[in-house]
Swiss-Prot record:
Keyword Chaperone applies: no
A Pfam family per the record: AstE_AspA_hybrid
UniProt keyword list: Cell membrane, Cytoplasm, Hydrolase, Membrane, Metal-binding, Zinc
Natural source organism: Xenopus laevis (African clawed frog)
Catalytic activity as recorded in UniProt: an N-acyl-aromatic L-alpha-amino acid + H2O = an aromatic L-alpha-amino acid + a carboxylate; an N-acetyl-L-cysteine-S-conjugate + H2O = an S-substituted L-cysteine + acetate
MF annotations from Gene Ontology: aminoacylase activity; hydrolase activity, acting on ester bonds; metal ion binding
Superkingdom per UniProt: Eukaryota
Subcellular location: Apical cell membrane; Cytoplasm
Membrane topology: Peripheral membrane protein
Designated name of the protein: N-acyl-aromatic-L-amino acid amidohydrolase (carboxylate-forming)
Principal cellular location given in the protein's record: membrane
Amino acid sequence: MSPPVSQVVVVGGTHGNEMSGVCLAKHWLQDPSELRRKSFTADILLANPIAVERCVRYIDRDLNRSFSHELLSASASESDSYEVKRAREIYQKYGPKQSSLNFVIDLHNTTSNMGTTILLFKGDNFALHLANYLKTKCVDPSFPCHILLIDIPEQGHVHLQSMGKHSISLELGPQPQGVVRTDVLARMKVLVNSSLDFLDLFNQGTEFPSFEAEVHQVLHKADFPRGADGEIQAFIHSELQDKDYLPLKPGDPIFQRLNGDDILYNGEKLIYPVFINESAYYEKKVAFIATEKKHCFVPALKLQN
């Protein structure tokens, strides 16, 4: 059983060039009526306003990697980056972590062909119920729903969504950085409204039965092949491009050199790559993220009296 949800925050602009969340946050700041439900009204947060103004991912560092306990609790300094200062401002408003803030919905876009990806922390059964509700109620073959688990110890949580006791990030793509695609924008709007509907139904006593969830769990991150100078020597193969969440077998091509030579996947087992050729991950030296598909039992969810 879980207590009622009272404080919900919808976040856009955590990355300033991911335009679906930016546009929706700006719209709802002007007219929040769509965020009102019988049992609560969601707050709206434009997380990184300077990055939004400049239409860049971040100013000094990734805001979505700036919510560690160490950064949030450290003494302020003039040398602190803009994003660290902004993370502390958000923490001051909504913190401490996982206390009064019941649910965070953080809105993101990806250049990868990720459809509707729902990121949540492993063990957050409340968020899994919400994800299952979205998969059931928001069926769209153009943007199939996938659940991607963030499987790291709580003390290692650095994402903005970790401010909430429960949370999801909606990662929709493909969409180029700094660009608005109306199909992606409309899809995200539907998903946010359906998420708020779920939370309102829960508050009004709707019980959600147990189920078995299909999830993807991260195995490792794969970098591009690089030379001694650190330069990329081969790129995502055309047969892998846009194949997020599809099985990759040992021997399948993953990279191609400029001379046309293929580099094959030499792992020992089947994997499911995600964030394939994600533009923002070039600086992180990530060509794709390898995941495995798993099934987990999620117990029933009901309101705590």
